[in-house]
């Protein structure tokens, strides 16, 4: 834990310096009621103070637990937050596109993530803030995020932290138990949880990535398949290798 707290302080100093050099006023991020966004919020508040951090709580068919978790987070942690109702915008968009969220729930879920991204960047530009992502090392390694959705950010503070490290920081910051004990979820569709969707637990993934666990052939296939499907998420848009001579 001592090394983790040392890393945290180095991270906070780096964040502060980077934002200052960027001539931004502060940082903005989505607050979902999950443990990753809660830890990012705690880091942001401690680093930049109340006025220069902003948590957007974006409502799109959120669960009752989402409401309870975000409410308790804001009340206990005293985050600077704004509630944004996006449900009407989401419903209008999927209707315009002819998408039924109950049938094509994955497409609809990714639209939710991208609508939140649009909202974050609109507020970021309005207030001269930089956008903080909430993804951890496991999610980035497997590509478990929505391209141009929750994967879009200016700074990814948790990018080198395992899920177990995020839990340790949550304890360090005294994050409410309702957040720590709930099943990790991106809240993309009803009943969705990260571990059910991936087919493997964060504990297994943490141990595997540290080299402390040899996965079964079935679990190895899950990890390799997830990484292969998400490879494009880690790359810039592909360009045709043959250069066009535009001078002729």
Curated annotation (Swiss-Prot):
One Gene Ontology term of the molecular function aspect: NAD+ synthase (glutamine-hydrolyzing) activity
A cellular-component GO term for this protein: cytoplasm
Chain positions recorded as Mg(2+) binding sites: 36, 139
Catalytic EC class: ligase
Transmembrane parts of this sequence: none
Highest taxon above the source species: Bacteria
Enzyme Commission number(s) of this protein: 6.3.1.5
Record PANTHER family: GLUTAMINE-DEPENDENT NAD(+) SYNTHETASE, NH 3 /GLUTAMINE-DEPENDENT NAD + SYNTHETASE
This protein's name: NH(3)-dependent NAD(+) synthetase
Biological source species: Mycoplasma genitalium (strain ATCC 33530 / DSM 19775 / NCTC 10195 / G37)
Gene label: nadE
């Amino acid at each position: 834990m001592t090394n983790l707290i040392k890393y945290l302080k180095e991270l906070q100093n780096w964040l502060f310096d980077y934002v200052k050099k960027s001539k931004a006023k502060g940082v903005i991020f989505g607050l979902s009621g999950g443990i990753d966004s809660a830890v990012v919020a705690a880091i942001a508040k401690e680093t930049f103070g109340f006025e220069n951090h902003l948590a957007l709580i974006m409502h799109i068919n959120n669960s009752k637990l989402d409401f309870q978790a975000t409410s308790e987070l804001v009340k206990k942690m005293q985050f600077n937050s704004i509630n944004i109702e996006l449900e009407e915008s989401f419903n209008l968009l999927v209707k315009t596109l002819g998408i039924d969220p109950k049938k094509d729930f994955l497409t609809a879920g990714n639209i939710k993530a991208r609508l939140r991204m649009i909202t974050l960047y609109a507020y970021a530009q309005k207030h001269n803030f930089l956008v903080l992502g909430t993804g951890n090392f496991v999610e980035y390694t497997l590509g478990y995020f929505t391209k141009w959705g929750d994967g879009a950010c200016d700074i990814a503070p948790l990018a080198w932290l395992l899920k177990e490290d995020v839990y340790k920081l949550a304890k360090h910051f005294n994050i409410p138990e309702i957040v720590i004990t709930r099943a990790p979820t991106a809240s993309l569709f009803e009943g969705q949880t990260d571990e059910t969707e991936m087919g493997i637990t964060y504990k297994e993934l943490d141990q595997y990535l540290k080299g402390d666990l040899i996965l079964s052939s079935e679990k190895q296939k899950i990890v390799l398949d997830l990484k292969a499907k998400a490879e494009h998420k880690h790359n810039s848009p592909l360009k045709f290798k043959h250069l066009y001579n535009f001078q002729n």
